[in-house]
Amino acid sequence: MSDSETEETKISTEPVENAWAMKIPSFKPEDNPHGMVEESSFATLFPKYRERYLKEVWPLVEQCVAEHHLKAELDLVEGSMVVKTSRKTWDPYIIIKARDMIKLMARSVPFEQAKRVLQDDIGCDIIKIGNLVHKKEKFVKRRQRLIGPNGATLKSIELLTDCYVLVQGNTVAALGPYKGLQQVRDIVVETMNNVHPIYNIKALMIKRELMKDPRLANEDWSRFLPKFKNKNISKRKQPKVKKAKKEYTPFPPAQPESKVGKQLASGEYFLNKEQKQAKRQQERSAKQADAAKRQDERRNKDFVPPTEEASSSRKRSSAENASSKVDVKALKAKLLKANKKKV
């Protein structure tokens, strides 16, 4: 082993401070001089409305993949795109990158952006958001939050993550560096889980400023990040009739009395069939008699005459008679008192 090779191994085994800042080592034709053993191919379908655009840009697609010794085919009858390796292909992973490129193009990503995925330090992520929200109205509202007014929110996400983001249908297609793809996925998933994207955008902006200060490299940044509390806490619906809680007892509840037990207590258990039937008939007739009595009382209420009040003339005469009566004793006492005063 030469000195240069030993130096490279030493460098690779040293601890890394920031793994995201590391440059991905390039894969060269010298690393795989024998090429591929077998041909590999990937195909993807595209919607009808993309047919016209793909037909226009397909010569550029063929030219782009030919640089990496790949072949591209467009089938307008079946509505599919195919990428294949050739005998000259030396990069084993380039076919995966080409597959991602045609997937992005099928999802309305323009060719100028999709071809960037063929670079080593660029990746793509297709985030499925259709099954994250059950109600369609909520889904449309939260997806619109991700785009923002005039696409302002989406543009700010792109600037902070250095990724190209396209929201369409039930998916979000992201294209950019791997660190940015992680951030985009977090923002998208949290937005669909009813966390407004502005909170995550604000946190990313603060982190970007903190990264500029080398003194804070080994410190916890959570004290600088904003903490948002959910104000819309859904309260549990209270029942209309609340049952009073019974006092706790360590003993099990008493066993309910069975039908046989009730019959034994009343003595009905020892009666024969005819006696039981006679008792039931007696109870039934007693109930019928009681019901008939109540019915008669209710019917006879209409025939009871109302109580007549005394007429006004009678009242007046009785009042006059009461006033005409003179208390003789009181009058005598009054006269005697007056005579004494005179004397």
Swiss-Prot record:
Superkingdom of origin organism: Eukaryota
Record-level Gene Ontology MF annotations: RNA binding
Keywords attached to this entry: Coiled coil, Developmental protein, Nucleus, Ribonucleoprotein, Ribosome biogenesis, RNA-binding, rRNA processing
Renumbered residue ranges of the record's region Disordered: 232-343
Keyword Membrane set for record: no
Subunit annotation: Monomer. Component of the ribosomal small subunit (SSU) processome.
Name of this protein: KRR1 small subunit processome component homolog
Protein's organism: Drosophila ananassae (Fruit fly)
Gene name per UniProt: dbe
